[in-house]
Amino acid sequence: EKGFGFISTENGQDVFAHFSAIQTNGFKTLEEGQKVAFDVEEGQR
């Protein structure tokens, strides 16, 4: 709905995620509890 959210890492940190960073075909969405692979990058705030 908002176009962004947070991904929880295995060590408990929350990482900001914007929908434009989701690399998939079709509708870019993630479900709560879904396992994902990701790289953390520094960005503008």
UniProtKB/Swiss-Prot annotation:
GO molecular function, one term: DNA binding
Subcellular location: Cytoplasm
InterPro entries (alphabetical): Cold_shock_CspA, Cold_shock_domain, CSD, CSD_CS, CSP_DNA-bd, NA-bd_OB-fold
Domain CSD: start-end pairs: 1-45
CDD domains linked: CSP_CDS
Matching SMART domains: CSP (SM00357)
Cellular compartments per GO CC: cytoplasm
Subunit composition and interactions: Homodimer.
Protein name from the UniProt record: Major cold shock protein
Organism of provenance: Streptococcus pyogenes
Gene that produces this protein: cspA
